[in-house]
């Protein structure tokens, strides 16, 4: 497992260095020690024999058996775990982040579609084609096996998870950009420069010869392609790689023997595969990027591969970029092809500086969404302002007018007044209780004054019965402690007379006013006597006498008013009795009214009125009967005198007892007459209908 992850993370970075430098023409500087060591290993490939190759195959088979046992215990996937897939994709994304390539790419919409079955078939063909390669293949594998063993031992100290975390951070920062970065190998890649990984977790280590820093840029007119590794499975070199990717299931492998076939074929089949490559790419429209990346990983820069990259044609470069662009466009198809057992992801070798059209479309869509959001915000602001205006209008409509406020203020003032009266009542009642508890004359007189004020409050509250009670309580206390000619008694009698008058008790009111006058007269007599006795200082008595004399006319007027009210009350009683008598005698009105109406109804047909005009005549008759109600009773005195005998049945010549009584009787008669007129109109309508029929 350790070797699997180690080779897993190192191979994409090596591929970045090779393919990126080939496309851009820029070479990565590496230490001189590594160059010399790698060159020496390449030279030693000539001394490798067939026995070394067989030993390496046995080691691979042993590693595969160990992998199967570890799979059973750990429950991991034989082909490739999902976690390894995600790590690989993230590693490859991170490897292409900072790659600076100025040439634009052409987009190919078609996706990678090579299945594991096809890879298996091509791997079988590749085995047959790899047999005649002979010594060159053996030499390459033997040299690589030695270097790979040394590198594998060195790589044990390197943690694959650290590299994974590093690339994860890079992928998260620039996930949507199609940029490939040439990144110098980390410690893991420096220690294991030749380690590559097949798709099915097969660790393939080859000797990577560093590219010269002064290498020339790509020759556009060349015909020797490195693109041969990206063509379809019909080519032998690719079939060998597919066998390497699919045929081996165990990741912890130190060397893959099938890599040698590709390395040997690079020099011999350059021209043939360049032609086949152009045709296959043009026909398919989209090359299997996964297999292309796997081939590039397995055949890392050897001298022959370096020559291929330097002489690659411009048309083939465009095809490489074209096949790399779709892999960035659709991550999902690539991941599906990985799950099917295809080769290493193609994203490692992407040399793109400009954003793909999909990214441009996404950017345009983001701009459109931002513009829409801004428009929505502006619309919300305008709607908010409109809502505020509506709320302000509603508030203005809800604000009451001045007249309404005044009308509301009136009840409030009344409530305040009522509140003040209630407060005064409470305070006076409390004072009354306090003074009554004291038995002194002064306290009792204060209690009497409290009763007097409580009576006045009751009068203001129109509670006349309560006022009468309070005045009587005050009067009883004053009579005990005051003299008969005291002015306080006169005042109490006067207030009591007013209360009786307001309560329509005119007899009692007249009596109280009379007593008040008597008290005042007594006071005046006493003052005259005192004035005669005090001959020197009579001015004070004279002033008081004058004041009392001024009060007498007012009290007498109150007495007269009470008497008149009493008389009017009597007249009102008589009027009510008369109305009651009129209502009781209204039983005679239907006959009299019916006779008068019948005579009128009999006259109309005599005038030759047609039955069609009867309806209009009814309305005319009703109007005539309503006129006495609308006219004032004073103007109809003559009519009343004529109609009284008819309505009252000859008993309307009664002699009135007085002018007022006669007027009241006339009003009662007018009411009875109006009732009779209404009843007569109803009967007239009935008679007219009968005649019309």
UniProtKB/Swiss-Prot annotation:
Covalent crosslink: Glycyl lysine isopeptide (Lys-Gly) (interchain with G-Cter in SUMO1): 642
Biased composition (Basic and acidic residues): 54-74, 82-99, 145-156, 164-187, 307-322, 627-645
Assigned GO CC terms: cytoplasm; nucleoplasm; nucleus
Compartments (UniProt record): Cytoplasm; Nucleus
Name of this chain's protein: Nuclear autoantigenic sperm protein
Encoding gene, per UniProt annotation: NASP
Organism per entry: Oryctolagus cuniculus
Family listed: Belongs to the NASP family.
Subunit architecture: Binds to linker H1 histones. Interacts with histones H2A, H2B, H3 and H4. Interacts with histone H3.3. Interacts with histones H3 and H4; NASP is a histone chaperone that stabilizes and maintains a soluble pool of histone H3-H4 dimers. Interacts with ASF1A and ASF1B; the interaction is probably indirect and mediated by H3-H4. Also binds to HSP90 in the cytoplasm. This interaction stimulates binding of NASP to H1-6/H1T.
Tissues showing expression: Testis- and sperm-specific.
Acidic residues composition bias: residue spans: 29-53, 380-400
């Amino acid at each position: 497992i350790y070797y699997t992850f180690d080779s897993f993370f190192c191979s994409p970075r090596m591929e970045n260095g090779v393919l990126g430098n080939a496309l851009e023409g820029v070479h990565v500087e590496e230490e001189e020690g590594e160059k010399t060591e790698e060159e020496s290993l390449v030279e030693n490939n000539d001394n490798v024999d067939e026995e070394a190759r067989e030993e390496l195959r046995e080691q691979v088979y042993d590693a595969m058996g160990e992998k199967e046992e570890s799979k059973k215990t750990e429950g991991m996937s034989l082909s490739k775990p999902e976690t390894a897939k995600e790590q690989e994709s993230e590693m490859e994304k991170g490897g292409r982040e900072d790659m600076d390539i100025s040439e634009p790419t052409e987009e190919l919409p078609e996706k990678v579609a090579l299945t594991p079955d096809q890879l298996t078939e091509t791997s079988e063909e590749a085995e047959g084609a790899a047999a005649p390669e002979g010594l060159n293949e053996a030499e390459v594998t033997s040299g690589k096996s030695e270097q790979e063993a040394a590198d594998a031992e060195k790589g044990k100290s390197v943690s694959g998870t650290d590299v994974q975390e590093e690339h994860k951070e890079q992928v998260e920062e620039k996930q949507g950009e199609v940029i490939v970065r040439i990144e110098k190998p980390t410690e893991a890649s420096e220690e294991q420069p030749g380690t590559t990984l097949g798709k099915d977790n097969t660790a393939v280590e080859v000797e990577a010869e560093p590219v010269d820093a002064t290498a020339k840029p790509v020759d556009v007119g060349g015909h020797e392609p490195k693109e041969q590794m990206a063509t379809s499975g019909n080519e032998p070199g690719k079939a060998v790689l597919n066998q390497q990717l699919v045929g081996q299931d165990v990741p912890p492998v130190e060397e893959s023997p099938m890599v040698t076939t590709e390395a040997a074929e690079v020099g011999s089949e350059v021209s043939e595969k360049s032609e086949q490559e152009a045709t296959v790419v043009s026909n398919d429209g989209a090359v299997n990027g996964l297999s292309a990346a796997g081939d590039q990983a397995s055949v890392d820069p050897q001298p022959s591969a370096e020559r291929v990259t330097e002489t690659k044609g411009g048309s083939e470069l465009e095809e490489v970029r074209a096949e790399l662009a779709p892999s960035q466009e659709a991550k999902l198809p690539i991941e599906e092809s990985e799950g099917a057992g295809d080769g290493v992801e193609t994203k490692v070798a992407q040399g793109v500086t400009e954003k793909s059209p999909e990214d441009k479309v996404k950017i345009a869509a983001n701009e459109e969404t931002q513009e829409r959001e801004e428009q929505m915000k502006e619309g919300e602001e305008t709607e908010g302002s409109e809502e505020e205006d509506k709320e302000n209008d509603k508030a203005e409509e809800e604000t009451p007018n001045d007249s309404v406020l005044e009308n509301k203020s009136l009840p409030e003032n009344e409530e305040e007044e009522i509140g003040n009266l209630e407060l005064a009542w409470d305070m006076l009642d409390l004072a009354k209780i306090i003074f009554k508890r004291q038995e002194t004359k002064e306290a009792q007189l204060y209690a009497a004054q409290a009763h007097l004020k409580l009576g006045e409050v009751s009068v203001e509250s129109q509670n006349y019965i309560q006022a009468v009670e309070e005045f009587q309580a005050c009067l009883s206390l004053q009579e005990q402690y005051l003299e008969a000619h005291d002015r306080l008694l006169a005042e109490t009698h006067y207030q009591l007379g007013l209360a009786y008058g307001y309560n329509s008790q005119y007899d009692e009111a007249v009596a109280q006013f009379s007593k008040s006058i008597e008290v005042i007269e007594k006071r005046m007599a006493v003052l005259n006597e005192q004035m005669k006795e005090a001959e020197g200082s009579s001015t004070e008595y004279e002033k008081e006498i004058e004041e009392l004399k001024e009060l007498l006319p007012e009290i007498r007027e109150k007495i007269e008013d009470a008497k008149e009210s009493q008389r009017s009350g009597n007249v009102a009683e008589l009027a009510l009795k008369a109305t009651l008598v009129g209502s009781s005698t209204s039983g005679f009105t239907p006959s009299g009214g019916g006779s008068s109406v019948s005579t009128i109804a009999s006259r109309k047909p005599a005038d030759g009125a047609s039955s069609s005009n009867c309806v209009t005549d009814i309305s005319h008759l009703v109007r005539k009967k309503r006129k006495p109600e609308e006219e004032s009773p004073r103007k109809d005195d003559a009519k009343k005198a004529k109609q009284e005998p008819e309505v009252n049945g000859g008993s309307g010549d009664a002699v009135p007892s007085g002018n007022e009584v006669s007027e009241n009787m006339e009003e009662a008669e007018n009411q009875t007459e109006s009732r009779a007129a209404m009843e007569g109109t109803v009967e007239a309508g009935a008679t007219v209908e009968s005649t019309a029929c």
